[in-house]
UniProtKB/Swiss-Prot annotation:
The gene is GCD1. InterPro entries: GCD1_mitochondrial. It comes from Oryza sativa subsp. japonica. This is Protein GAMETE CELL DEFECTIVE 1, mitochondrial. It holds the Pfam family MRP-L20. Essential for fertility (male and female gametophyte functions and development). Required for the integrity of female gametic mitochondria. Involved in embryo apical-basal patterning, and particularly dorsal-ventral patterning, during early embryogenesis, and endosperm free nucleus positioning and development as well as early endosperm development, probably by modulating the expression pattern of related genes (e.g. AL1, MYB3/AL2, CYP78A13/GE, PNH1, HAZ1, MPK6 and OSH1). Expressed in roots, stems, leaves and florets.
């Protein structure tokens, strides 16, 4: 095969066999065909060619007038010119180049698509581990409707109901209501509506953002074995892991919600100027400071397990703590739990 390929490329064929050798080969062909034949001839020295089909070889194969089965064979009597050989070589090279270019295009498209594949995989894994992270955008028109309903009937449209109706977290409802309240106060001061061109643009092009869909907190549990000594007579049944995860998630969500409300109330008072944070604004009053005193309990305990707190006035009298002071005390109370952090944040 290698010699034939070199022959086709260079246009040179081997020399024809001598005439004597060709005559000897031709004289042996009838005897060979007679052996290959499955049935004898007619007794007159003739050969029956029809039965030789069982061998897959016909007379034309030996005469050189028929091509081999399934592949063309170039006759030695037709020499290949150098021009034809060069054209065939160029065609083969062009075919190789076209195959290489096609493979390069396919490989480049495959490599370029890896960025989108990785982003899609990251989003899918994020939804699997924390399904509540899908809620990422809420239209301004929906925020306006939320604030209008709460302002008209706050007892009916509570924070819990608005969070359930609009399928968002309660923390977002608190933030949206406070934001719309501040915008309404600012419009009242300016005497004209605020510029809402950005909000209108976002509402008119929602395809650029992910729609909100049932925000909720999902706890991140440690993946490690938990060995327990079960009581005698235990039937071998355990709780569903999804049920345990749901209960823990609800407890953590309630704790996060309470902390958010406390911080939001503090920020509201801070924005209103009721909380003084600057060091030069905390000057000693003319009549003296008011101190908070904590009385220890029976077993010298502090906090909820011990005594109680009250305010000591400069004149020596005392009074219970007001709402502002209670808020300060609650913010200073340490939270005896691990820090709750949402994954992928």
């Amino acid at each position: 095969m290698l010699a034939l390929r070199k022959t086709l490329l260079h246009g040179r064929l081997p020399a024809a066999p001598p005439a004597a050798a060709a005559a000897a080969i031709a004289s042996r062909i009838p005897a060979l065909l007679r052996r290959l034949s499955s049935s004898p001839g007619d007794g007159q020295g003739g050969d029956e060619w029809g039965s030789s089909w069982s061998t897959g070889i016909t007379k034309e194969h030996f005469d050189g007038s028929d091509a081999a089965v399934g592949r063309p064979v170039t006759s030695p009597s037709k020499p290949v010119s150098p021009e034809l050989a060069a054209v065939r070589a160029m065609d083969e090279e062009d075919e190789i180049f076209r195959a290489m270019e096609r493979d390069n295009r396919e490989a480049k498209a495959y490599v370029d698509s890896w960025g989108d594949r990785m982003r899609e995989t990251c989003e899918l894994l994020k939804q699997v581990r924390e399904p509540g992270s899908r809620g990422s955008y809420l239209k301004d028109s929906e925020k306006q409707e939320m604030y209008r309903l709460h302002k008209e009937d706050p007892e009916t449209y509570t924070v819990e109901r608005l969070a359930k109706d609009f399928r968002v977290m309660r923390q977002r409802v608190h933030a949206i209501l406070w934001l719309k309240e501040m915008e309404e106060e600012e419009e009242r001061k300016l005497g004209k509506p605020l510029d809402d061109s950005v909000e209108v643009l976002l509402d008119s092009c929602p395809e650029f953002f992910n729609s909100h869909d049932r925000e909720f907190h999902v706890a991140s549990l440690p993946y490690k074995p938990d060995f327990k000594v079960m009581p005698e007579g235990w039937d071998g049944t355990t709780r569903d892991p999804d049920e345990v995860l749901y209960e823990i998630s609800m407890k953590e969500d309630q704790m996060l919600y309470e902390e958010f409300v406390q911080r939001l109330q503090f920020n509201k008072k801070k924005v209103a100027g009721e909380v003084k944070c600057h060091k030069y604004s905390r000057r000693r009053p003319d009549d003296g400071w008011t101190y908070m005193v904590e009385k220890l309990g029976a077993q010298s305990k502090r906090g909820s397990g011990g005594g109680w707190k009250f305010a000591s006035l400069p004149d020596g009298s005392s009074r219970p703590l007001n709402d502002m002071e209670k808020m300060y005390v609650k913010r200073e109370t340490p939270k005896r739990r691990r820090r709750i952090m949402a994954p992928f944040k």
